[in-house]
């Protein structure tokens, strides 16, 4: 009953502008894990997606999605939410999210949440990373896409990731 009451109240106020008491506007951006969640963003008057967790494409599948499958997924989200922005985060695998059927790609670590995961994993498995980056770049032709790298720990990782991104841009 409390949940229904909360949801009813939310439906009443979700059309109001998101503004702080001192008049500063705030963008309400949703977090999504799957392309079919875009309807919720529009239903609740979200202004876009602030975090698209792309690793769930990998985690919810028995196999690694192809570049084309990723592109179609990202394109669907971008087109359905246009002209709203969509922030697509590259793979955050490892730690609590190893890829099913590919455990050998994720070494055992004493602290997997801070170790070989996310951007570090992508930079060591460049073929996976490039497939994803090309898919994101192609999807960006269909709307307002922003890119987020997870778990960057320094300027060198950012430079390496951006170099791979530029390679992909040149390939396309």
Predicted segments, located by residue:
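Conserved glycine-bearing catalytic or ligand-binding loops at nucleotide- and phosphate-handling centers
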Residues: 1
């Amino acid at each position: 009953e409390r949940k229904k009451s909360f949801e009813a109240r939310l439906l009443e106020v979700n059309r109001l502008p998101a503004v702080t008491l001192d008049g500063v506007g705030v963008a309400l951006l949703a977090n999504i894990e799957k392309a079919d969640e875009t309807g919720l963003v529009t239903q609740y008057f979200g202004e876009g997606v602030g975090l698209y967790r792309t690793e769930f494409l990998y985690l919810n599948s028995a196999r690694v999605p192809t570049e084309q499958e990723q592109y179609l997924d990202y394109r669907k989200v971008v087109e359905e939410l246009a002209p709203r922005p969509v922030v697509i985060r590259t793979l955050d695998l490892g730690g609590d999210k190893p890829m099913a059927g590919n455990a050998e790609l994720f070494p055992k670590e004493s602290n997997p949440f801070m170790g070989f995961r996310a951007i570090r994993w992508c930079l060591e498995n460049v073929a996976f990373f490039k497939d994803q980056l090309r898919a994101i770049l192609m999807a960006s032709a269909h709307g307002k896409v922003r890119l987020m790298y997870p778990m960057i720990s320094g300027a060198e990782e950012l430079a390496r990731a951006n170099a791979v991104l530029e390679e992909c841009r040149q390939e396309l």
